[in-house]
Amino acid sequence: MSRIGKKPIALPSGVKIKVGEELEVTGPKGKLTVPIPEGITFEQADGRLEVKRASDEHAAVHGLTRALAANAVQGVSAGFVRELDIVGIGYRADVKGKIATFTLGYSHPIEVLLPEGVDLKIDKQTHLVLAGHDRQLLGQVAANIRALRKPDPYKNKGIRYTGEVLRKKVGKTGAGGK
């Protein structure tokens, strides 16, 4: 039995579930759909949602489906947040509407169009706070922004996740000045 798959999902107040071809989760932050694989069923009772599987052949997707459903429930009720830091002299970000502009040491500023459902707030031009209700989309947008200027292993300059621990490499030793 999948340990993750057999855990019930608590449904907060204000979250509505509709099971059909897909699991439709609606809440105060929006609406998400989760695909239901073959052999997986949902049972709703006492403010909880349980994921059941028809046989052990469907064990591979049992835990996955439960995790996706739990992320959808949490997303439409509380939402998700991802934070990034920009480190480097002259590196900064600005946002106007749904377009984020990054100055990252290249010869040109880089513009990123934020998808629907992802909001970006910028504190002090170097701290980004991404918020949204779809965990997968939010993580992908954060990864795309980080990929614009990954942290340099020698000076640790670039865009990193807040709290990310980076290993700094040692530079050349022979050519250093006295």
Curated annotation (Swiss-Prot):
Example of a GO biological process term: cytoplasmic translation
GO MF term list: rRNA binding; structural constituent of ribosome
Cellular-component GO terms for this entry: cytosolic large ribosomal subunit
InterPro entries, sorted: Ribosomal_uL6-like (IPR000702), Ribosomal_uL6-like_a/b-dom_sf (IPR036789), Ribosomal_uL6_a/b-dom (IPR020040), Ribosomal_uL6_bac-type (IPR019906)
Superkingdom of source: Bacteria
PANTHER family, A to Z: 60S/50S RIBOSOMAL PROTEIN L6/L9 (PTHR11655), LARGE RIBOSOMAL SUBUNIT PROTEIN UL6M (PTHR11655:SF14)
Family named by the database record: Belongs to the universal ribosomal protein uL6 family.
Functional note: This protein binds to the 23S rRNA, and is important in its secondary structure. It is located near the subunit interface in the base of the L7/L12 stalk, and near the tRNA binding site of the peptidyltransferase center.
Official protein name in the record: Large ribosomal subunit protein uL6
Organism, scientific name: Solibacter usitatus (strain Ellin6076)
